[in-house]
């Protein structure tokens, strides 16, 4: 992720607070680049069974890069098994898929059984999101400055979902954190949630997550 003249790598050492502060402090649009095939190849090294979950291919080239790396790796390591999953999503749903993969592997299932089970599971998962700021959408030209200003002044939160094809779609606009929590809860019920694991990913918004969790 490039913000002005600084480059941030999204790994375990990333200082997210510093990155966000830098992002909000500059008027320039931020830019991002997906992992290269070489990045994936280094991660594959030494493994016999590999499961890889990428952010939705509609937002990033990560999935295509991973598929290319898979094909390259299998040329030299034909006995390795690799399954690349396009999450068709982002954020918490990616975490949900990774957690489920770990559960399936811990059950001692074969590689093929894990592939079948995670494919079935993914059909039942869903991403809902609440966006409190639209600064980067304005900077990147995806939203007009006028709309961005109105959203900020009226404290409007965007409530949306990842579609079945992996695009991010707007569902509702809610004014203020309380109404956005209610809107998110309504969308969860509308989506047919009837129990099961929920992953909530947030940045500096623990209060809203707790309010939703308490519903």
Where are the language model's segments positioned?
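N-terminal glycine-rich anion-binding loop in soluble enzyme alpha/beta folds
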Residues: 1-39
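Active-site cofactor/cluster-binding pocket
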Residues: 35-70, 74-75
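Structured helix-beta-strand junction loops
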Residues: 25-26, 46-47, 124, 194
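Conserved beta-strand scaffold positions in the cores of enzyme catalytic domains, especially
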Residues: 52, 82-84
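A short helix-to-beta-strand connector/capping loop
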Residues: 77-81
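Mixed-charge interfacial surface used for oligomerization/domain docking
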Residues: 1-6, 59-62, 66-71, 83, ...
């Amino acid at each position: 992720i490039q913000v002005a003249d600084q480059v941030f790598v999204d790994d375990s050492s990333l200082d997210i607070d510093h990155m966000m502060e830098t992002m909000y402090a500059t008027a320039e649009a931020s830019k991002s680049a997906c992992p290269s095939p070489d990045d994936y190849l280094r991660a594959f090294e030494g493994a016999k069974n590999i499961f890889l979950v990428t952010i939705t291919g509609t937002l990033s080239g990560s999935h295509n890069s991973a598929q290319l790396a898979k094909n390259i790796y299998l040329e030299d390591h034909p006995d390795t098994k690799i399954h690349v999953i396009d999450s068709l999503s982002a954020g918490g749903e990616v975490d949900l898929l990774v957690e489920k993969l770990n559960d399936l592997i811990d059950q001692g299932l074969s590689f093929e059984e894990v592939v079948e089970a995670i494919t079935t599971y993914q059909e039942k998962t869903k991403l809902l999101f609440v966006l409190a700021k639209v600064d980067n959408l304005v900077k990147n030209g995806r939203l007009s400055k006028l709309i961005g200003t109105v959203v900020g002044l009226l404290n409007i939160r965007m409530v949306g979902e990842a579609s079945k094809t992996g695009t991010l779609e707007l569902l509702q606009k809610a004014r203020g954190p309380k109404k956005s929590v209610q809107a998110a809860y309504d969308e969860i019920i509308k989506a047919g949630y009837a129990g099961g694991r929920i992953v909530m990913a947030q940045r500096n918004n623990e209060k809203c997550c707790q309010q939703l969790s308490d519903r």
